[in-house]
Amino acid sequence: MTIKRFFALAFALVVLFLAEAQSIVDNPVAPSEAIVISGNARFTVLTPEMIRIEYSENARFEDRATFTVLNRKLDVPAFTKSEDDTFLYIETSNLKLKYRKGTDPRTVPASANNLKVVVSNHGVPSVWYPGKPDPQNLKGTCRTLDGLMGESKRSEMENGLVSRSGWAVIDDAWTATRSDGGSSYALVYNNEVGYSWWAPRADEHAMDTYLLGYGDNYKKAVSDYTKIAGKIPLPPDYVFGYWYSKYASYSAQDYRNIMADLKTNKIPTDVMILDMDWHWNGNDYSQSAGRGGWTGWSWNTNLLPDPKGLLAEMHSKNFKTALNLHPADGINEVESPEYFSQMRNDLNGKYLEGNTIKWSLDYTDFTKSFFRNIIRDHESEGVDFWWLDWQQYLTSPYTKALSETFWCNHVFFNEATKRADHRPVIFHRWGGLGSHRYQIGFSGDAHISYEALAFEPYFTATASNVGYGYWGHDLGGHAYTNDELVNNPNLVLRWIQFGVFTPIFRTHATADGRIERRIWKFPNFPTILEAVRLRYSLFPYIYTMARKAYDTGLSICRPLYYEYPEQDEAYTYDGEYFFGDDILVAPITTKSGTNGMTEKEVWFPEGQWWSVDTHELIQGPCKRTLSYTDEQIPYFFRQGAIIPYNPETVMNVTERPDRMILNVVSGANGEGTLYEDDGDNPDYASKYAVINFAQACEGQTGRYVISSRKGTVGRAPVNRSYQLRIFNTPTPLSATVNGQSATYSYDPNKKCTTVEVPYGSCSVDRTVIVKYSETLSTDIVSAKADKMKIVYERNSKKLKGSFDRTKKKVALEISNSMGKTVLRNTYSNVNSFTEDLTNLFPQLYIGKVVADNQTYVRKFIKN
C-alpha cells in the first residue's frame, strides 16, 4: 500500500469513529419482520448469530424491557423460515434452528428432541439445545472478591457471553436465578420517579432465552450484547485518576494532612473517598441502629464538624468526593433525627418499624423521599458520587425475588442522571447481567497476598465477557492473614503497578491501624510514585479506550482470546490481557528474588511487540522468560501503534494540557486516535472531538500525520505542541514538520527518535517526515526470538514450515477448531519440514509448532 493510499484510509477512520459514536434509542419491541410465531413459541431473529426463544403456555410474550435487555429493535438480518408437518425451520448465515411444533422446547431431561440450533464456527457445526451444559464457557464475573484467597473465587464466577463451545445463552426468564438470588423483572417507565421501574413479567413461567451463536468471534458477541442490553456509559474523566481511600476514623484535620502530604510529595490525585466513619455509628456500637453501625446518613460532627466546608476545601484542591453507604437498616431516629422526621412526615409513618424507617427502595414513595431529603442534601453539600457498599439483603423482603444489589444500582444511577451538568456515576457491587449500565464496580475485600493479586488480572479482563468493564479493586489488598505481608513494600508496589493498567486506580484497606495506605510512607515510594505518574501519562489513551467501550461494548481490559481465539496460549496465559487496542500487559504478581529481580514468563501473540521497559521489539508468537527490576513493568506496545500520553507535569486527569506526547512504534503502518470531551458533560454522546494519528513507513522514510481536530469540544486547548517518541528506529538524518526543519534527537539505548512538533492550531493537519540512516525495520530489532514461516499450499495440500536456523527438536500438532488433535509429528535437527494433509477433512485447522521451546501457531483452511 502506498503512503498516500494509507493515509486516505486512516483519515477515513475519523469519519467512521464519528458515525459509530451516535447514540442509539433503546426500543424493547422488535420489528415484526424479525419475529416468527409458532403456536405458543415465539422466535425473534436479532442478528445472524443471536436469536431470542420464548415459550409461554398462554402465548403471553414479553415486549417490555427487562433487567437484562432494553433494546430489541435492531436491523433485521437476512433469514429464511420454512416448515413441514412436524418442524419449523429458521436459518441465518450462522444459525440453523429446528423446532418441533406444538411442544415446549424445554425437556426433562434436557435434550434436542423439541428444539435444537446448529451453530457454525468457521464451517464447523456445534449443536445447542435448551438446558445443555457448557463446560467450555469462558466465564464473566462474580458479585464480590470479599475474602479472596488466591483462586478461591474462580469457581464463583458466572457464565459469560462467550464460550469455546461456539455458543452461549442468556436466560432472561423469571425462573432463572440472577447472581444475588433475584429474578429478571420487566422495566416500565414510571412518571413518579422519571425513569424505568420494576414490574411483574407477562408470564412468570415462560421460557425467555437468548442464544448467542458467535463461534469464536468473541468481540462481536460482546458488542452485540450491548446493542440489546444497553451501552456501557462513559464515566466522568476524574474517575480514571488516583483515588485516595482508607477505612479509618479520619478527622477533618487528618484529611487536611493527607491532602497536604499528597501535594508535598507531588502525588497526582483526583478522588478523595470518605469511608463509613463520615456518619454516626461507624464505630460506635452503643448507638448502633442495627448491624454494628454500618448504616448511617448524618455527618459525624465529632470527626467532621464542618463537612460542607471540608468538601469545599477538597474541591478547591481539585479532589472529587464520594461517601460510602451501607443502606442495610434504613433511617434510624437516633442516628439521623432530622432525616428521620422529614421522611416520616413525607410517608405518613409508612415503612416505620420502631424508631427506624425500614430500607424500602422497591417503592417509589420511599425512593422519592429518601433521595429528596438525604441524598440531594448531601450532594448540595459537595458530594460528587456515591460508593454503594453492601449490607442490605440479597433480595427484597417485600418484593419477591427483587435483587437488592441490582435494584440499588439501577435507582442510584438513574437518580444521578437528574444532576444537571454532571455525568451519572456510581461505585457499586456487581448485580448480574445488565449491571454494566451502571459502570464502576467495587470488587470488595481481597486478602493481602500475592495469590490474591495474581487472580485479579484474570478476573478484571474476564469481566469484559459480560460487558462489566470498570472493576475497581482494593489495590494493596484489604485485610491480612499473614503478618509478614501487612505492609510489604514489594507487594504494595506490584499491586499498584498492576492497578496502573486497570480501569480504576484506587488504593484501599480496612480499618486496621497497622495497615498503611499512605504510599509516601513506604521505603520504595519513589518507585511507587513512578507508577502513579505512568497512570497519569496514560490517561489520554485510557480515556480514548473508555469512549470506545461506550461505542463498541469492548471494555478497556480484554482477554487475549478476543484477538487470538485459535491459539491455546490465549486461554492458558490468563494473567496477561490487552489494555485497550494496543497495549499488552503481563503484570508481575510474585515477590522479587533476593537479587531484586523477578522472572516473568510472557506469551507474545502473533505480531511484533515493543517492550517499553527493556527497549526491544519481540516477534510473536513465542514464549519468553524475561527478568525485571522492581522499577520495571511488563507492558508492550503493538508495532504500528500510536499511543497518546499526557506530559509528566499533569497532576489531575481533569487537566487539558496544551502539550502531548505521542508514542509511536515504527516498522509498520498504523494509526491511533485521541478522544476529547469536556470531562463531565452528560451530552458526550454528541458533544466531543477526535484527533486522528497515522504513520507510514517506506524505505528510509517515516511519515507521521497529526490530523486536524474533528468535532465539538469546549475544554480542549485550541493550540497544542507535540513530542513524537518514535521507537524501533535507526539513527535519524533529518526531520521536518509541514516542510519546516524540526528539532529532533536520538537515544541509541532506547532506539528512540524524538521529534518536537511546535505549538500550533489543532484545526490544522501536521505532517512530520523523518529521514533515517537505514531502512525502517518491519522485523525485530532484538535477535532473541527466531523467525519462522508456516505455509499451507492449497495446490499440493501440504503444510510447510521453515526456520531461520537449524532446530534440534521440533514438534508439530494440528487440531481442528473444536480442539481435537488430528495429527502429531516430531522432527530432529531440521530447518524445515513438510506434512501431506491430503487425508484431512476440509475445514479450519490450527497448526502448533514447538521448536526448541519456542511456540508458533498458525490457522489455515484445508481445501
Protein language model annotation of sequence segments:
Residues 65-78, 611-630, 734-757:
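Solvent-exposed beta-strand/loop surfaces of large extracellular or lumenal domains
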Residues 82-236, 246, 259-264, 626-647, ...:
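Catalytic and substrate-binding clefts that recognize carbohydrates or anionic sugar/phosphate headgroups
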Residues 43, 51-53, 90-97, 584-587, ...:
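Short, well-ordered beta-strand segments enriched in hydrophobic/aromatic residues
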Residues 413-414, 433-441, 455-456, 463-473, ...:
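Catalytic core of carbohydrate-active enzymes
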Residues 6, 17-20, 776-863:
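C-terminal outer-membrane/trafficking sorting elements
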Residues 47-85:
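A low-complexity, Ser/Thr/Gly/Pro-enriched, surface-exposed linker/loop concept
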Residues 120, 128, 268-528, 563-565, ...:
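Aromatic- and carboxylate-enriched substrate-binding clefts and catalytic-loop regions
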Residues 1-26:
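Bacterial Sec-dependent N-terminal signal peptides
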